[in-house]
Amino acid sequence: MKRLNNLESYWMPFTANRDFKKDPRMVVAADGMYYKSETGQDILDSAAGLWCVNAGHNRPEITSAISEQAATLDFAPSFQYGHPKSFELASRVADIFPKGLDHVFFTNSGSEAVDSTLKIALAYHRARGKGTKTRLIGRERGYHGVGFGGISVGGMPRNRQYFGSLLTGVDHISHTFLPEKNRFSKGSPEHGDYLADTLEDIIALHDASNIASVIVEPVAGSTGVLPPPKNYLKRRREICDKHDILLIFDEVITGFGRLGKATASEYFGVTPDIISCAKAITNGIIPMGAAVVSKEIYDTMMDEADMPIELFHGYTYSGHPIASAAGLAALDIYRDEDLFNKAGKTAKYLENIVHQLKNDKNVIDIRNLGLVAAIEVAPRPGAVGARGYEAMKKAWHKGLMLRVTGDTLAFSPPLIAENHDIDKIFEIVQSVLKELD
């Protein structure tokens, strides 16, 4: 197939641009579990695009909804005006999210959703007369998008180091990565719940009267798939309740079925005060995100506001009509095909298959929870990430798209994946691992 255009103008995100142009990995179509490369090769998608295409690619239900909406109402401002589908989608999201989290603020991405949660937390405390509660607490190795709020509370050094001074008044508690104790764990690891107590050290230093919120990914994804230790999130909730600190779950990856439930909050039985979500809310077809907040937060903002506008925050495309239509169609698919429950069942098969690779000479750890898994390969001396990157490129040429972060190969297949799809994914991965030096 003829190259569609030259590759010089587009600056690709989170990509080794110079290397990509030497050996491009271009897709031109997608359907179901597969992409189609520009050379006509079928590429099995083991990453749901980028953790987002939960119902599989090219769903006619969603493309039809988008087309019909674009032909009816292409855009409507969300500042001081509304349209029905944004209200309908908000209600549908609230219905499947944890009880009590029933108000939805729409954004355009996970990064915007996270920054919105932080601003809402600060505004909430100010509205109830506790304006000194301004400190934000993140976690080492945490990923919360690429907005200045998100990289400030995030704990991935490469995402922070080039951008100078970030938000002030931010602290980070310890990560939960304990390979010496939890290597090759299946599901939530046994060791590490005590690490939630490092939050108490920060509270002792700054006093709870100065701390607004704590944000955490229930399952850390971009840092290499780190499921939380057993009881860790429950302990985090208890500490936040004790000190009147808001707990935020960043569910941009885990929201909408990734763990076999609508949310990780439901899966773990721990309800935060705010959830950020995005990606699968529209099946990845149209950019959209949301901050889903508790009734207590919303009611406080409504009751205590001293101006007609209760929250001076929003985006031009918040609740966009076409994105709302896509979201409603995606939620219909998740419900009608029972995809959340299907993912929970497939997760057990995935766990069994991925751990069969533990004896490969290059594999130093395997982690999994729900329909998410990671294989960590040993780094090359003096070249951290090189072996993982090579694995990603080899997999592509063998017909597999996978996500790589450092030397960790991450897997999050669409929720429609059947057992034979899982088999094929890891047959290719096994072949790739054998070729790594």
Predicted regions and their residues:
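Conserved N-terminal phosphate-binding loop of PLP-dependent enzymes in the Aspartate aminotransferase
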Residues: 1-437
